[in-house]
């Protein structure tokens, strides 16, 4: 399974770890993903999604169906 948000598509970012002497080595900044069970009212059931914490906050404002429509995903497959 990929470390990617189901609704926003967020994934890891390439960055540098910078030491005190300013030597730079490559590292990954991972997305803060949470396995979340979300109630889907029109489907009348729970849906298990892997969401970033930013997506969870946005979900409370927009709602599940609006975000799924924007992402172009079919909730019947989850």
Swiss-Prot record:
One of its GO terms (biological process) is translation. Disulfide bonds: none annotated. GO terms for molecular function: structural constituent of ribosome. The keyword S-adenosyl-L-methionine does not apply. One of its GO terms (cellular component) is ribosome. HAMAP family: Ribosomal_bL28. This is Large ribosomal subunit protein bL28. It comes from Nostoc sp. (strain PCC 7120 / SAG 25.82 / UTEX 2576).
């Amino acid at each position: 399974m990929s470390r990617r948000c189901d609704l926003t598509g967020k994934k890891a970012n390439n960055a540098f770890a910078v030491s005190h002497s300013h030597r730079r080595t490559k590292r990954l900044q991972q997305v803060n993903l949470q396995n979340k069970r979300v109630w889907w009212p029109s489907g009348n059931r729970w849906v298990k999604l892997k969401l970033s914490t930013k997506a969870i906050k946005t979900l409370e404002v927009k709602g599940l169906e609006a975000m799924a429509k924007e992402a172009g995903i079919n909730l019947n497959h989850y």
